Amino acid sequence: MAAALRFDNIGKVFPGVRALDGISFDVQAGQVHGLMGENGAGKSTLLKILGGEYQLDSGSVLVDGRAMRFPSAAASIAAGVAVIHQELQYVPDLTVAENLLLGRLPSALGWVRKRDAQRFVRERLAAMGVDLDAQAKLRRLSIAQRQMVEICKALLRNARVIALDEPTSSLSHRETEVLFKLVDDLRRDGRALIYISHRMDEIYRLCDACTIFRDGRQVASHASLANVPRETLVRQMVGREISDIYHYAPRALGDVRLSARALEGDALRAGASFDVRAGEIVGFFGLVGAGRSELMRVIYGAQRRTGGALMLDGEPLDIRSTRDAIRRGIVLCPEDRKEEGIVAHASVAENINISCRRHGLRAGLFLDRKREAETADRFIKLLKIKTPNRRQKIRFLSGGNQQKAILARWLAEPDLKVVILDEPTRGIDVGAKHEIYGVIYELAKRGCAIVMVSSELPEVLGVSDRIVVMREGRIAGELARGEANEEAVLNLALPQGATAHAA
């Protein structure tokens, strides 16, 4: 019997880069096949070929034994294939129901029957165990909720082949469990699934088989993971041993650099108060909706401050805009890289230099292109940013390399004082994480106060000098590195009455 999906010697070349070279593996009906590899290894490129976004240069894709060409996303969908990319695709001003039924809304005489659409979507969401308001507009939903909409869209199309690219990167523990149940149900229903994740726990929990990519090549395939140690997968992914991904080392701390006192914003239920010292890394942990990102955006001037006070190096700090924050040496690497972090149509060099340009104007008026080129080349080499050259459009880089470019932007700032990192390694592979942690430590050694928001508890525990836990829009507690462990942090993060054991 033919495999539900087969990749046969797939090749893809971009200018200056061989993105895929000789990729061959099968996915059976009723199987979850994991794909692992560093950012830029070619995993997402393969899914874009499967989804009709890119055209392959060599090889073939077979669905149920038939060779297929997907000149468009519509052709892929018509063949029973659904690809859910890490960078979500939705219409922000349409409702959940309208996004889910886009292109096939029920109508009569040319008029869309919205009530019928909403009822149908509510029934299907309930059957899938997903708690979403069918009438809510997508722009009002969290990133986690938008991701669930994309997953539900594939299920509503009854796709027989489903590819998921980092589907849990923004999901809460509860939402992740809902997704896992859906994946298990789809496997039992005989669907073929491709599952890309950098999270080892997910790969071992869900996947029947696994293929490893490195630098566009297929370096290993495992028909079963039952007897494959995690260390083997890491070594195959990165081509080297990584014994301690966090490589934490204590450092000398300076005086208090950033102080928040009774800070309030539209999404913060109680005044938030905390300090961060020069050279200190303070991790902020909390469940989805705890208010961490909202607090960071208030500090950065991206959201309105309704009360409380900020101080920088002991002096009152009045920030009314993000421009004010940057001028005072406070920067933010946002959670949503695509929408808020990068300038997608600009080059890697332009993205790195976009903030520090004001320091390097010739005669106070003209851009110093030579200086910008040297700055970009220096950080591309220092941070090992995978790009053909500094002129490459940043949108063509992997998520991990885009994040490195954003960090390079702030490393190039001469007067940096506070760095806020919101989910700095979301959707990034283990090798790139290792390198990004090194950048964070380097910023701390320079005397920057580092505030790191992360939903990955091992990361918070592994990198932070101190941990602040948020719950339901307020600070629930604080733990020193020496007293912090998973149970202690979760007991602060969970709603009152729940315990870490219950989670």
Swiss-Prot record:
It is a peripheral membrane protein. GO terms for cellular component: plasma membrane. ATP binds at residues 37-44. One of its GO terms (molecular function) is ATP binding. Its EC number is 7.5.2.12. Residues 5-240, 253-497 form the ABC transporter domain. Keywords: ATP-binding, Cell inner membrane, Cell membrane, Membrane, Nucleotide-binding, Repeat, Sugar transport, Translocase, Transport. Its main location: membrane. The keyword Cell division does not apply. It is an enzyme of class 7 (translocase). It comes from the Bacteria. It catalyses: L-arabinose(out) + ATP + H2O = L-arabinose(in) + ADP + phosphate + H(+). It is found in: Cell inner membrane. The keyword Glycosyltransferase does not apply. Belongs to the ABC transporter superfamily. Arabinose importer (TC 3.A.1.2.2) family. The complex is composed of two ATP-binding proteins (AraG), two transmembrane proteins (AraH) and a solute-binding protein (AraF). Part of the ABC transporter complex AraFGH involved in arabinose import. Responsible for energy coupling to the transport system. This is Arabinose import ATP-binding protein AraG. The lineage of its organism: Bacteria, Pseudomonadati, Pseudomonadota, Betaproteobacteria, Burkholderiales. The gene is araG.
